[in-house]
Amino acid sequence: LSGDHADWLEAVITYFEIRPSLVAPEYQGEIASMSKEVERSLQQKIGQLETVCLPLPSPSYDWLICNQEAKAKVYQANQGKDIVLSNGLVSRVFRIFPNLATVDIQNLMTGENMLRAVSNEGILTLDGKNYSLGGLDGQPEFGYTQYKWLDRMEPFANSFRVIDFRISEITPRINWKSRRWALEKKRNPSGKQLTFLLEGPDELKGVKVKLHYALYDGLPCISKWFEIENRTGADINLDSFVLEQLAMAEPESPVEAKSPEMFRKPNIHVESDWGFLGFIEKIADKTEHWNPDPRYTSQCN
């Protein structure tokens, strides 16, 4: 055995479930295209949504003083290629074809476009193997995004693919018990919940993932969670997951600062159910990580 060359005599390869095969070094896996039936069904459902033009306008009111106009709705845009979830304060734009991917998150109150590049909707590690939840690959530059690039991008290999979506009203997720000293009267939250249904690649036939996005009325707040449905008849193990993977635009470019701790974070606040220690946000949230993007090579630091 020397370097990357080996001579094997009477070699025997053992494997589990999936038979190994020889492929080129750059092979990333088979890319499955969206079926015509699924494409027609999605186009028909998207065509029933109200159409908006992007970018959306900024609100003319201060939501902290008067937020009655901030109603969550689901729209279509870009000739039915995109689904837009917005309440007039924030918006999230999803490209649906050829696979689900968030292409923009906008703070409509400030006019900020929060994303500089397209990624995926998360990563599941099932039985030791990583699978992308939706996502588009092939972006030529990761410092910014042009909409014309999206039409040439392709799904990630071995990724979960969108096959359906539904829109519903937000329902209470916990039974909150109001106290006598609480000034706020108990009321149910209102808004829209957008749920995408994704199916696994061929090796995970029967495994589906529901991605839920809830946008509240009157609040610049989006909630996200997922469910896994296993109808394969066999056990699968969820080793780990990444619920959100966003290529955020940096709020500043300090060429002198070389330590990541010196960089300003994007203008976004992230919360999860996993809060620990003294519940001070910057140290309590152990699920939020700001990491370098190896794809982003056009920035000096």
Feature annotation, model-predicted:
Residues 49-301:
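N-terminal accessory beta-strand-rich subdomains and adjacent acidic, glycine-rich linkers
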Residues 1-49:
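Gly-Asp-aromatic-enriched flexible segments
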